[in-house]
Amino acid sequence: MLLSRFQQQLTQHFPQQPNVLLSLSGGIDSVVLLDLFSRTTTPLRAIYIHHGLSANADNWADFCEALCKQYNIPFILQKVTVDKSTGIEAGARTARYKAIAEHIQANEILATAHHLNDQAETFLLALKRGSGVKGLSAMQIVSHRQNMTIFRPLLSTTKKEIQQYAKQQQLCWIEDESNQNNHYDRNFLRNQILPLLLQRWPQFNQMIARSAKHCTAQQQLLAELLDEELHRYANIDEKSLQISQFKHFSPLKQQQLIRLWLAKCDIPMPTSAQFEQIISGFLNSATDKHPQLRLKNWTLRRFQKTLYLTPQLANTQHFCQILSVNQTIDLPDNLGQLTRQPQQIIYQQTHKTNRLLLPESLRTVPLTIKLHQTGKVKRYQHPHSEEMKKLYQQAKIPVWQRTRTILVFFEDQLVDLLTQHKNQQNND
């Protein structure tokens, strides 16, 4: 029976009862999942994402709200704007998860109604794209995305079982007219290809699920075998990967370490052509080169013998502001905050704090804060001018950070650079 199997999945994967945010579309799958959860004592909320792609979306939102009132479950309606540049399906999925991430609470898991037929479709779509074992692993019953835990308790349940349950419980649901549009790859597989395959091989979906499970096992084993080395070279918090030893590794091992690093950083996986570019342009080029590669909303960069992932960076090079004693200023583009005290400047960014100790002669005078400087500059209490490029290199500041590094000036003289790397001190 579907209910008992559902309860078993819930207990197996979450022995301590979780709080659940259910992704509710109003279709038969999510309505059945809502009904199943309602028959447990699980604390439950539901969210409907209004993509604005159908003229019926308002009616579907009203249906979901009424359904949640019937079940006495808190309901969230969230409208989103879909970026169609990467395709409607991908854009809708990205917008949906982004909206859910904004609403889900720290103690909640996300429950979705993906089932066995969806798993088969996902596997075949990955096969069409030429995916490796990670892509062919398809969906997992429990997975993680954007710091969310996602639970798919119906993943081993067939569409027919869901339909039978809905009929037995006399449930009501809506039909999305776009599901019949075979222009979309998933619908083409669902409506035309899989019915033929199931007619020939009735257990085809179960066999696909088995293959996906084998791929998952291979991917997990690979990650386990390389985890120690990845830990040695990668800094996940800073999204950096040290590659000085990669010349001793085979191209396959190089690629797998980069794949695992990107996955841990929750970055979209590059295409095969992009991986070839990473191996040739990032790992095998001269250390004085500064290649970069766009990966969706991130940019892969290299400085010296380290790879870095950076988000889209705003232009901050023209920032210039006076910093007086006992004053606090906010830096642009989330670069942090500076607080001036008589003896020091305190730099705070996220959970990091750094201090620049000021010499006696500068403790009462106004100082100027800049984020960029080129050419030669006179150092405070130094006899000669120096090239900023040399100072940046000495401080090991990557090229793209040189328009985002705090420079403390007294009049036209550079007092020091203030970074997150180390405490700094200037003495008379």
Curated annotation (Swiss-Prot):
GO terms for molecular function: ATP binding; tRNA(Ile)-lysidine synthase activity. InterPro entries: Lysidine-tRNA-synth_C (IPR012796), Rossmann-like_a/b/a_fold (IPR014729), TilS/TtcA_N (IPR011063), tRNA_Ile_lys_synt (IPR012094), tRNA_Ile_lys_synt_N (IPR012795), tRNA_Ile_lys_synt_subst-bd (IPR015262). ATP binds at S25, G26, G27, I28, D29, S30. One of its GO terms (biological process) is tRNA modification. Its main location: cytoplasm. Its EC number is 6.3.4.19. Keywords: ATP-binding, Cytoplasm, Ligase, Nucleotide-binding, tRNA processing. GO terms for cellular component: cytoplasm. The keyword Ligase applies. The keyword Cytoplasm applies. It is found in: Cytoplasm. Disulfide bonds: none annotated. Belongs to the tRNA(Ile)-lysidine synthase family. The N-terminal region contains the highly conserved SGGXDS motif, predicted to be a P-loop motif involved in ATP binding. Ligates lysine onto the cytidine present at position 34 of the AUA codon-specific tRNA(Ile) that contains the anticodon CAU, in an ATP-dependent manner. Cytidine is converted to lysidine, thus changing the amino acid specificity of the tRNA from methionine to isoleucine. This is tRNA(Ile)-lysidine synthase. It comes from Haemophilus ducreyi (strain 35000HP / ATCC 700724). The gene is tilS.
